[in-house]
Amino acid sequence: MALRYFSHLPEELKEKIMNEHLKEIKKKEFLENVIKAACAVFEGLTKKESVEEDDILRFSGFLEGLSAYYAEATKKKCLVRWKKSVAINLKWRVMEEMHYKLYGFADMEDLYCSELGFPNYGEDDVAYHDGAIVNCKQLEVVFDDLGIEFMSIVIDRGSIKIEL
C-alpha cells in the first residue's frame, strides 16, 4: 500500500527517501563488518591459556557492548555463553570483570563462592547472569518457562558466534 503512494510523490522526495534507506542499509552493513572484525581479533584470545589483564578488560568491554547491542536490536535477553573448551582462566576472569563492573568490589565474595561450588561444570556451558555464574541449560529452561526470549553470543575455543 505504501508503494502505491510512493509512486505519486515528487522526485526530490522519492530520492531523499531512497537515500535515507540506503544510508541505513550501509550503516547496518558497516556495523556488521566491524563486529566481524572485532570478533576475529578476540577469537585469538579464546585459544590462549594465559591472557594479560589488559586483554581481559578489553574482551569484557567488547562482550558487554556486543550483548547490549544485540539485546537492543533483537529485543531479546542476550547471554554470553561460554563453551567448555575455553580456558577456565579466561572465562572466569572475564565473568569476574563483568561482575565487578555491575556490583563493585564489595560483592566479589559471592562470585568467588559460586566459582568454587559450581554445579555440573563438566556437563554444560556456563554464562554470567545477574550476579551469578549459571548453567546455561538450566537458565534456558527457566527463560522458556517464563516466556522470556533470549539469544546467545557463544564463546568457543577459537570462535565467537552470534546465535539469534
Swiss-Prot record:
**Residue window of motif LXCXE motif, interaction with host RBR:** 111-115
Q: Enumerate the UniProt keywords alphabetically.
A: Host-virus interaction
> Which stretches does the entry tag as region Binding to host SKP1 protein?
9-22
Q: Does the keyword RNA-binding apply?
A: no
User: What does the function comment of this entry state?
Assistant: Interacts with and disrupts the function of host retinoblastoma-related proteins RBR, which are key regulators of the cell cycle. Induces transcriptional activation of E2F-regulated S-phase and G2/M-phase-specific genes. Inactivation of the ability of RBR to arrest the cell cycle leads to the stimulation of viral DNA replication.
Family per record: Belongs to the nanovirus Clink protein family.
Per UniProt, subunit arrangement is: Interacts with host SKP1. Interacts (via LXCXE domain) with host retinoblastoma-related protein 1 (RBR1). Interacts (via LXCXE domain) with retinoblastoma-related proteins (RBR).
Instruction: Identify this protein by name.
Output: Cell cycle link protein
